[in-house]
């Protein structure tokens, strides 16, 4: 079944500007600026006012209409990023060998360096994306805090760190060592 026209209305909060040109979305807010390319999704954008945008799909089937809600969620995540920001907390879990995690900079590129994982001599490195800040927690022992404006960048960095510390060729019920996401949320909860 084809839907003749389906639309969603996205409200824009005060202090945030959204510019859309050729399906390239640019969101500017108090914390900075984010851009997202949506050229691969066939949707139309109409600016109703400075505070609202209408996203429309013409002659779309079920999957095409489902992409409409995805586009709305992606832009809403950009708006949340430039107003409040995203923060992920990760905890080190180890039974015997204490995991040593440092943030190092090499040739202008930052890395998270993981040493002594399961007592291994190998040093594991994860590249930190632009716009993401990584720091060791000052209040909690064995905790890493990732924060930034882009939900995709922060969550992908957290996933990369968790993935590089996967235990292979051993029973994962017994070997629980690793670095895991313990908490995710917003930097400014009240904004």
Task: Give names to the regions the model predicted.
Residues 1-191:
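Ribosome-associated RNA-binding proteins
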């Amino acid at each position: 079944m084809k839907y003749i026209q389906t639309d969603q209305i996205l409200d824009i909060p005060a202090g945030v500007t959204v510019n859309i040109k050729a399906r390239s979305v640019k969101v500017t807010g108090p914390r900075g600026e984010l851009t997202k390319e949506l050229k691969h999704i066939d949707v139309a954008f109409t600016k109703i006012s400075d505070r609202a945008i209408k996203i429309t799909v013409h002659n779309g089937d079920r999957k095409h209409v489902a992409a409409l809600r995805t586009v709305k969620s992606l832009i809403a995540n950009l708006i949340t990023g430039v107003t409040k920001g995203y923060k992920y907390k990760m905890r080190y879990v180890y039974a015997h060998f204490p995991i040593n995690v440092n943030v190092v900079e090499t040739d202008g590129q930052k890395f998270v360096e993981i040493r002594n994982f399961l007592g291994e001599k190998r040093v594991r490195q994860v590249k930190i994306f632009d716009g993401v800040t990584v720091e060791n927690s000052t209040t909690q022992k064995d905790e890493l805090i990732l924060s930034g404006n882009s939900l995709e960048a922060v969550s992908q960095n957290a996933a990369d760190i968790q993935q590089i510390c996967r235990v292979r060729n051993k029973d994962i019920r017994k070997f629980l060592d690793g670095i895991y996401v313990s908490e995710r949320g917003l930097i400014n909860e009240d904004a």
